[in-house]
């Protein structure tokens, strides 16, 4: 990537270039006979990165497919194979792609190994087991206990840290090489700094008006998911943060051509097949999405070189917390980003996100006195979203749209 002059590029240009280049690098690695890993979105990438294994992310790949309206064909294929439409849309589309290996987005090379961490959901177990079984490849698992009391216990940290040692052993067997602990610590330093830079970007949304729309945040999120162990990821976020600070100094809003009248938190994953529609309807009302439970999940904090610190970070995901922890996370986002209300995406694909929303929403209304509206949708399956319902939900909780 050294041939590219990043200094002459905007952060958006860097984002687009790096996302495409990262997948191309994985395809070239596969063609050379190098190892490729499919990993869940918040699995500990640091281990594969340290061993020179190219890592790509099925969830992010399906995001690109869904946003380009290419998911229905894959979903239909999966359902014809016997996968119920109650299963996560990411899983169905990815399992179909594994068979057909064609899509409207970037083609993703098949894996030589899969790595999952159930700190976001348990659907991953059977999803990744099916991949490993079908392709006859190893499946590496990091099992993270659920923090029912929203407190990460020392026992849980030790349990996960011991599994990290097993991941190291498996990687040594797979690659035929000794694990490079010096490289591992260096990767951890890079990833921790990238996470800090990403956290700063999400925090800058607290400015009024916000220099960044949350929908732009969803796009930039691709880097922290796919490249958080690579230096170019941090370069992009530092460029982004400089741009955002300049916009704040100039009092400019991230929604071009529209005054920021209201600020909301988006609860849940984006509705990728209708990302443009969900954004434009909000913009029509002068509503800027400035906070979200989704992008900040990748702002991992740990001490480089410390396995227990790494284990604690990967065990502390928002989805892995009990009801009080989930509530506190949302309360802090609403207060920190000065939100006037909340939109909750009742995402058919993500039961982990949805099942707590009703009670959390009630509690937020009672204690913070913020209006909350919900809409039905899906992160990948367009059949579960109604544009009219979304518009109606906003109509009865928002001022009149701009002329």
Mark where each language-model region is.
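A short, acidic, amphipathic alpha-helical segment used as a generic capping/interface helix at domain edges
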Residues: 101-103, 321-338, 355-359
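Internal, well-ordered alpha/beta segment that forms a basic, Gly-enriched binding/recognition surface
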Residues: 108-173, 179-181, 186, 193, ...
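An N-terminal, globular interaction/scaffold subdomain
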Residues: 42-87, 92-95, 99-103, 127-128
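Conserved small/polar residues in nucleotide/adenosyl-binding loops
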Residues: 396-403
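Short, flexible loop segments at boundaries between secondary-structure elements
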Residues: 369-385
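A charged, amphipathic alpha-helical module
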Residues: 2-35, 161, 165-294, 300, ...
């Amino acid at each position: 990537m050294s041939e590219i002059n990043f200094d002459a590029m905007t952060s958006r240009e860097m984002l687009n270039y790096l996302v495409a280049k990262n997948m191309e690098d994985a395809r070239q690695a596969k063609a050379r006979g190098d190892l490729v890993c499919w990993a869940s979105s918040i699995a500990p990438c640091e281990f594969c990165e340290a061993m020179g294994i190219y890592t790509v992310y099925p969830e992010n790949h399906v995001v690109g497919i869904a946003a380009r309206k290419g998911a229905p064909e894959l979903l239909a294929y999966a359902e014809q194979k016997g996968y119920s439409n109650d299963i996560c849309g990411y899983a169905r589309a990815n399992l179909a792609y594994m068979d057909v290996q064609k899509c409207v987005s970037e083609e993703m090379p098949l894996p030589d190994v899969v790595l999952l961490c159930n700190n976001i959901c348990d659907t991953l177990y059977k999803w990744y087991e099916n991949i490993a079984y079908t392709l006859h490849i190893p499946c590496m698992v990091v099992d993270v206990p659920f923090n029912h009391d929203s407190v990460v216990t020392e026992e849980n940290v030790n349990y996960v840290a011991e599994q990290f040692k097993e991941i190291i052993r498996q990687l040594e067997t797979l690659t035929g090489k000794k694990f490079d602990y010096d490289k591992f610590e260096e990767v951890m330093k890079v990833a921790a700094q990238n996470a800090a830079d990403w956290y700063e970007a999400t925090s800058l949304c607290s400015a009024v008006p916000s220099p960044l729309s949350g929908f732009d945040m969803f796009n930039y999120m691709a880097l922290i998911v796919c490249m958080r162990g690579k230096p170019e990821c941090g370069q992009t976020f530092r460029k982004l943060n400089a741009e955002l600070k300049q916009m704040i100094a100039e009092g400019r809003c991230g929604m071009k051509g529209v005054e920021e009248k209201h600020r909301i938190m988006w609860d849940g994953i984006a509705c990728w097949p209708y990302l443009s529609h969900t954004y434009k309807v909000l913009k029509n009302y002068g509503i800027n999405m400035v906070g979200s439970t989704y992008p900040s999940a990748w702002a991992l904090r740990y001490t480089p070189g410390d396995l227990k610190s790494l284990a604690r970070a990967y065990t502390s995901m928002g989805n892995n917390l009990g009801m009080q922890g989930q509530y506190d996370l949302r309360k802090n986002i609403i207060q920190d980003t000065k939100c006037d209300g909340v939109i909750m995406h009742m995402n058919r694909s993500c039961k982990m996100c949805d099942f707590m929303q009703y009670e959390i929403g009630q509690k937020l209304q009672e204690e913070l006195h913020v209006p909350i509206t919900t809409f039905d949708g899906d992160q990948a399956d367009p059949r579960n979203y109604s544009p009219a319902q979304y518009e109606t939900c906003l109509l009865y909780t928002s001022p009149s749209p701009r002329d």
